[in-house]
Amino acid sequence: VSRRAAFALIVCTLALSGCLTGKRPHLSAATVPQAGTPVGDPAIDAVLGKLDAVTAGPATAVYEVLTKYGNTTNPAAVALDPGKRNVTIANARFLQTESLAITCSVDGSTGCVDGFDVQRVSNVGITPDFYASDTAKRLRRDAQAKVGPAVARTDVIAQQPATCVDLPVPNGTAVYCVLDNGLIAVLDDGDVRIQLTAFGATVDPTAFVQPA
């Protein structure tokens, strides 16, 4: 092998994705529609419109979250009341009221800290906003990446009517379902599967009590 060919091989190895597969597609923030902006596909916009107008409560939703990398399952729950929310994911608790925003542990094993420490749930693959706004972000990204027409449908999830859309994307089919009140009912993409298991249009006031 000539010295020039060997050098070219080294360069190609260091930039493997560029030499073998071409430049990877990248969606910049500028190309993804902002929150509240329709994407122009009626099937997708029907779901986005509800996610963007999620209820302020009262509402309580319970979920099961499958993180596909590692195949681990964790519980999650959302309690909403106007001006307040309590979100639990695995052993992390995110509490927000009119006067505070803190992160605690569900079992009390660690103390509370000011603000939302999303690193506590980084291994789960979702954030405290998973129940609406973060799912809307995912859907807008998938809307840009879809490789075929989106399919609209309806479903009944946890005994609640849901509006759904299935999107063919490069790694399979992404599924999004939302309740009429804007809470996510199902999200199934390449990273996670979030499944609503119970819903109630009431909330326990103790959900918003700060731990002693």
Describe each PLM feature range:
Residues A53, P75-D81, R93-L95, V147-V156, ...:
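Short, exposed beta-strand/loop patches in secreted or surface proteins that constitute
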Residues G18-L20, T103-S105, G111-V113, T163-V165, ...:
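Sequence contexts marking disulfide-bonded cysteines in secreted/extracellular proteins
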Residues R153-P211:
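Gly/Pro-enriched, hydrophobic low-complexity segments
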Residues K137-V151:
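A short, amphipathic edge element
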